[in-house]
A protein has these predicted regions:
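Ribosome-associated RNA-binding proteins
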Residues: 2-222
Length: 222
């Protein structure tokens, strides 16, 4: 009698099963500290989560803007003398800076670290064609109000990037303004519809007899 191999049993048990796809977590990074947010995101990536980071241009770094700008300009001067094309590569956009920060907190030379890094996507602003409406989360322990004292100076990452070569801050600002205005119009429309529905429901219930109203209340329809 030939027993089935473990591989054949596993294949048979997997047949017809749906492949598990992790839920995508959308993290809103407005007023978050760059290092703290990157550390928590890196840990969640290693646990197998898929993360989309939005509004990276509104991340914050400790210290004044001049100090952080000088530090980043010093980093821009670092290069490989024999062949500068081989690196280090200097990113100017806030999303790339955030990705690089997360990468430095992952074991990126192992397959596990490389797989985790592929699960992260970062954007400036909130692209409506990529990020679904609502459902954004924040990281409370990485927020600026939690980490910094009120008098501590800080730098907004987008403002610093604008001084070191990022060209699209005005474009992002324009798109964000358009998105907020569109969301406000949508909210106003839904509020109007909700108010109309409530008034129509009230009118309909006023025309119902007492006995029928009691029955409706019993089942939670009035």
């Amino acid at each position: 009698m030939v027993l089935p191999t473990r591989q054949a049993v596993d294949r048979r048990s997997r047949k017809g099963c749906k492949k598990h796809r992790p839920e995508i977590i959308v993290v809103d990074l407005k007023d978050h500290v760059l290092g703290r947010a990157a550390a928590i995101v890196a840990k969640q990536l290693l646990l197998g989560k898929k993360i989309t980071a939005v509004r990276c241009e509104q991340l914050t770094i400790a210290g004044t803007e001049i100090r952080n700008k000088i530090k980043y300009l010093q980093f821009l001067r670092k290069r490989k003398l024999s062949n500068p094309k081989l690196g280090p590569f200097h990113h100017r956009s806030p999303s790339d800076i955030f990705l690089r920060t997360v990468r430095s907190m992952l074991p990126r030379y192992t397959k596990r670290g490389q797989k985790a890094l592929r699960q992260l996507v970062a954007y400036e602003g909130i692209p409506t064609n990529v990020v679904p409406h609502g459902g954004r989360v924040v990281i409370p322990k990485a927020q600026r109000h939690y980490c910094y004292r009120s008098e501590r100076p800080y730098t907004v990452l987008g403002n610093m990037c604008k001084h070191v070569g990022w060209k699209y801050s005005d474009v992002v600002k324009k798109l964000e303004t358009a998105r907020v205005e569109k969301a406000a119009r949508h909210h106003k429309k839904t509020e109007k519809l909700r108010a109309a529905w409530k008034s129509a429901r009230k009118d309909a219930l006023s025309k119902v007899s007492k006995n029928n109203l009691e029955v409706l209340k019993k089942f939670g329809y009035a």
